[in-house]
C-alpha cells in the first residue's frame, strides 16, 4: 500500500492537534508537531506492507501547489489531517487530490472533520471517508488492528525521524518536541473539546514508555519538551515516579506541561522543577463562580490559587493562565471581574479566549436553535466559531477584546520592560497576524487554494 500522511498549509501556521484535535491558528513564527500524525506514522512504519510518505507542509511551509510537486506517484490512500481554522480549505484540497487522480482513496481526519461528516458526505462525496476517531486509531484500524489495544500505552515509541523535526522549534530557535504521559480528562467541563473527542476518561502511558519517548527526542537534539496532557498531574503518583526517573537517569531537558492548579502542592512542584519543569499552564477561566459551575467547571479558591502561583514563581517557573470571555450571559461587569481576578493572581502570562460551546450537535442546537454545523461555522484562520456566543457583545467585539485584554494584561505584569514586551510580542504581533489573515481570507474568496 502506498500511503501518504499529509498535514497541509495555506499561509498560516496551524497547530492541528491542539484544542481537542480541533486545531488552532498560531500567530507566532514557531511550529509544533501534530502528535496524532506522529503516532499514526510510527504505527504505519512498522507495517511491512506499507510504503509510507509523509508531507508536513505546515512545518515546511509548502502550499498546495508545492505539495503536488513533492508527490512523486499516485497513492493508494492519502490521509489529510484537517483543522477548524482551515477546514474549508482542507475539504477543497482533499477533493482536488481525489478529482485529479492523485489517490485512489482520500480520507479526511481530525475532530472538525468528524463534526462535519454528514455535511462533507453530502457536499463533497468524492472524499471517500471521514474519520470519527483520532488519526492514529484510523491508521491502526485500516492496517488490521496491529496494536493490542487503542490505549496510548500500546503505542510504539514515537518516531520523529519520519518528520522534518528540525522545523519544530520555538521562536528562539530551540527544538521543541511533544509527547504524552496521558490523554483525555475525566473532569467533565461541558464546553471542553477534549472530552467530546477523546471521551470523559483518562488514558495513561506507562512511565517507562514515556522515558523511552523522552530519550528518543533527546537523541535527536531536542532541548525542550512539551507534555501535551490535558491534565498532567491527574495521577500524582505517576508524576512523582516520572520525575524521579528523569532525575536518577540524568536526563537533562526543560519541559512544559498543562494541568489543573488545584492538583498541585509544594512537594509536587519541587520535584517537577528538579526534573526540569520551567513552564506550566492552567485554566482559571472566569471570576464568575456560578457561570463556571453551570458548565460543570470546579471553582478555584482565590487564596490557595494565588499561593500556588506565587510558589511557582519562587521556583522560577513561568506560569500561563487561561481565561474565557464571551460566555452567553457575559457583561462588562463580569468581564471586569475576570480581568481583575487575572491581575490579582498575577501569572507571568495570560491568554483570553472566546467561549466555545460544546460542539456535540444536539447540545449546540439546544443552546443555539436553528444553527447548522457547516464549514462556515468555523472562521478561517481564527480560533473561534463564526458565532455570536454572548448576548451582549458582537463577535467582532469579542475578537477585539481577546486581543486587547491579553495586551493590557502583559503591560501590567510587574516585570522589567513589561510595556515594551506587551507591545512588541502581543499587540504588534497580533495586529500583523490579523492583517495577514484578512488579506489571505480575501484572496481565498477570489482564487483556488492551488493559486496561492
Model-derived segments and spans:
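A structural motif corresponding to the C-terminal end of an alpha-helix
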Residues: 40-52, 220, 249, 275, ...
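Short, electropositive alpha-helical surface patch
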Residues: 60-64, 240-246, 331-348
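Conserved strand-turn element in the central/C-terminal portion of the radical SAM core barrel
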Residues: 287-296, 309-334, 353-357, 383-393
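Radical SAM [4Fe-4S] cluster-binding motif and immediate context
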Residues: 160-320, 340
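Acidic, low-complexity intrinsically disordered segments
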Residues: 2-220
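Catalytic cores of alpha/beta
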Residues: 117-124, 268, 329-344
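Short, solvent-exposed turn/loop segments enriched in Gly/Ser/Thr/Pro and often Arg
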Residues: 58, 83, 112, 228-235, ...
Amino acid at each position: 500500500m502506498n500511503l501518504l500522511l499529509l498535514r497541509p498549509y495555506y499561509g498560516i501556521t496551524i497547530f492541528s492537534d491542539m484544542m481537542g484535535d480541533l486545531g488552532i491558528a498560531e500567530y507566532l513564527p514557531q511550529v509544533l508537531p501534530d502528535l496524532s500524525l506522529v503516532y499514526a506514522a510510527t504505527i504505519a512504519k512498522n507495517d511491512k506492507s506499507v510504503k509510507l510518505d509523509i508531507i508536513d507542509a505546515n512545518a515546511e511551509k509548502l502550499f498546495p501547489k508545492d505539495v503536488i510537486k513533492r508527490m512523486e506517484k499516485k497513492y493508494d490512500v492519502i490521509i489529510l489531517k484537517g483543522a477548524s481554522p482551515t477546514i474549508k480549505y482542507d475539504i477543497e484540497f482533499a477533493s482536488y487530490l481525489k478529482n485529479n487522480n492523485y489517490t485512489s482513496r482520500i480520507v479526511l481526519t481530525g475532530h472538525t472533520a468528524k463534526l462535519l461528516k454528514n455535511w462533507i458526505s453530502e457536499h463533497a462525496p468524492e472524499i471517500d471517508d471521514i474519520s470519527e476517531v483520532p488519526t492514529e486509531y484510523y491508521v491502526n484500524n485500516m492496517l488490521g488492528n496491529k496494536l493490542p489495544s487503542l490505549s496510548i500505552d500500546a503505542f510504539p515509541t514515537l518516531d520523529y525521524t519520519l518528520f522534518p523535526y528540525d522545523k519544530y522549534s520555538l521562536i528562539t530557535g530551540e527544538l521543541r518536541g511533544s509527547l504524552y504521559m496521558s490523554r483525555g480528562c475525566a473532569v467533565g467541563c461541558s464546553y471542553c473539546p477534549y472530552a467530546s473527542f477523546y471521551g470523559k476518561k483518562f488514558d495513561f502511558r506507562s512511565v517507562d514508555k514515556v522515558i523511552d519517548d523522552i530519550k528518543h527526542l533527546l537523541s535527536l537534539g531536542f532541548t525542550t519538551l512539551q507534555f501535551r496532557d490535558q491534565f498532567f498531574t491527574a495521577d500524582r503518583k505517576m508524576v512523582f515516579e516520572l520525575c524521579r526517573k528523569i532525575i536518577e537517569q540524568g536526563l537533562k531537558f526543560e519541559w512544559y506541561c498543562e494541568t489543573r492548579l488545584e492538583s498541585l502542592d509544594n512537594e509536587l512542584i519541587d520535584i517537577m522543577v528538579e526534573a526540569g519543569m520551567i513552564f506550566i499552564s492552567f485554566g482559571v477561566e472566569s471570576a464568575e463562580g456560578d457561570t463556571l459551575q453551570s458548565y460543570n467547571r470546579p471553582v478555584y479558591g482565590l487564596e490557595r490559587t494565588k499561593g500556588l502561583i506565587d510558589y511557582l514563581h519562587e521556583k522560577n517557573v513561568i506560569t500561563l493562565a487561561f481565561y474565557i470571555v464571551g460566555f452567553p450571559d457575559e457583561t462588562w461587569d463580569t468581564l471586569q471581574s475576570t480581568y481583575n481576578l487575572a491581575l490579582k493572581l498575577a501569572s507571568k502570562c495570560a491568554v483570553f479566549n472566546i467561549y466555545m460551546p460544546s460542539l456535540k450537535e444536539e447540545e449546540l442546537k439546544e443552546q443555539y436553535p436553528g444553527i447548522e454545523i457547516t464549514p462556515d461555522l468555523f472562521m478561517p484562520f481564527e480560533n473561534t466559531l463564526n458565532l455570536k456566543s454572548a448576548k451582549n457583545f458582537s463577535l467582532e467585539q469579542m475578537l477585539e477584546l481577546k486581543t486587547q485584554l491579553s495586551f493590557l494584561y502583559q503591560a501590567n505584569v510587574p516585570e522589567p520592560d513589561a510595556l515594551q514586551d506587551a507591545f512588541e510580542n502581543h499587540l504588534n504581533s497580533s495586529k500583523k497576524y490579523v492583517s495577514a489573515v484578512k488579506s489571505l481570507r480575501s484572496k481565498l474568496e477570489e482564487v483556488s487554494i492551488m493559486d496561492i
